[in-house]
Amino acid sequence: MFMGEFHHTIDTKNRLIVPAKFREALGTEFVLTRGMDNCIFGYPLSEWEQLEEKLKQLPLAKKDARAFVRFFYSAAVQCTPDKQGRIMIPQALSTHASLEKECVLIGVSNRIEIWSQEKWASFSEEAEENFDDIAENMLDFDF
């Protein structure tokens, strides 16, 4: 399980340090792809394979299903951290997430997310302001 928030700097070669805590759970190879809210999702291979099985069940006749699968897979890449624990963020993913120098990596249950510091700060501020309303809307999940 992934949890926590870590701040790191992306270097001029688009390399980003993945926190040791996340590397242990991600394994030696994992998958990065476009995420919602203009971030990058990172999945351990086992989670990615489970997600793939679910995506294969989407009806090809539905335009939205085809669009989602294309969008999700087209930017997906397998990553292997180097000896310093860095990964190379492909330009397409970096652009999607508006990554600049300062980045935030967060753990979200079965995946990690990589955010630009600016976008994460904005998202966090809005979520915090609306947390009570969000929690109330989640009552069906019986926290």
Curated annotation (Swiss-Prot):
Predominant cellular place of this UniProt entry's protein: cytoplasm
InterPro entries named among the record's database cross-references: MraZ (IPR003444), MraZ_C (IPR035644), MraZ_dom (IPR020603), MraZ_N (IPR035642), MraZ_sf (IPR038619), SpoVT-AbrB_dom (IPR007159), SpoVT-AbrB_sf (IPR037914)
GO annotation, cellular component aspect: cytoplasm; nucleoid
UniProt domain SpoVT-AbrB: residue ranges: 5-47, 76-119
Source domain of life: Bacteria
Keyword annotations from UniProtKB, A to Z: Cytoplasm, DNA-binding, Repeat, Transcription, Transcription regulation
GO biological process: negative regulation of DNA-templated transcription initiation
Keyword Cytoplasm: yes
Short name of any one Pfam family annotated for the protein: MraZ
Quaternary state and interactors: Forms oligomers.
Listed name of the protein: Transcriptional regulator MraZ
